[in-house]
Amino acid sequence: PFINAAGTYTMLTASLMSQETMDAMEYASKHFVHLTKLQDAVGARIAKLLSAEAAMVTSGAAGAMTVGTAGCITGTDNKKILQLPDLTGCKNEVLVQKTHRYGYDHAVRAVGVKMVEIETEEEFRQKAGPQTAMALFFNDADKRGKIDAAGWVKLGKATGVPTFNDASADALPVERLSQYNKMGFDLVTFSGGKGICGPQ
């Protein structure tokens, strides 16, 4: 055992679950459920709580990044969905600020996309094109980049590129859970195993 004085880092098991959460997990483990219906119901409830268009519980923030990227590539086109990870005929680029590159962007690259690094608003506009599936923003690096969160959203709207904010470690205070959605990000992920204190 050790004392975690660093915070909710994944490699340090992020957070500890409450007894209420443990009791709910034990209760759930004793019942069969229709998973698709459960996912839909939970997503609808979370979306309502956050005033969001939709919500989804995934295997974790990294899983959400993979699923979100895939969704930006395929939309609702079943043919494209079934051909993944083959990106033939699909958008295959994701814009990202150079200062926002980090280990977990592998969850985006795992879909098969090419990360296109940019630094300025002008470069964003120049690089955004018909092959651009998404623009990834790493919330923890907000102060390191030349384009802040609001500017990233504005550029995404202006170029028609969906914006994704990885705010996995930034669930608290609770107002943040709807802040980035209200700001205009198309997709936002939070880690349930960090500030929300769910399973890691």
Regions found by a protein language model. Give the residues of each.
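Conserved PLP-enzyme active-site core in the AAT-like
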Residues: 1-12, 43-55, 62-200
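Glycine-rich phosphate-binding segment of PLP-dependent enzymes
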Residues: 2-36
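A short, well-structured juxtamembrane/interface segment
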Residues: 37-42
